[in-house]
Amino acid sequence: AGTDQEHPRMIVYSHTVTPDRTTFLLGKGPDPTEYIKDGLNTLIGWGADMLCVTCNTAHHFIDGFRDEISKPIVHIIDETILKSSQVCPQGAWLTATLGTMRTGLYQRHAKDSG
């Protein structure tokens, strides 16, 4: 976009009481699934017609209920793998949280995409 007016309209929702995703995945905290799902449905209620979650680890939970959400979700893992394969077909490095690494999100989605 060349100007502010050319950017898409966005709603940002930061629900700061959502339990830490990595802490849960390491067995040390509460499950954040319902908070994440509630946040997505809140955005839909506010008029969002497409959703994007910028937390890699959150997609571990989103994968479990993605079909329950009535609007499309831009999946950060799938989009990263797609772009990485176009830019660097021989492979790419990943820097991520321990939670993202332990879930095997990128490995699983990369395998599924071929």
Predicted regions and their residues:
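Non-catalytic structural scaffold of enzyme domains
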Residues: A1-G114
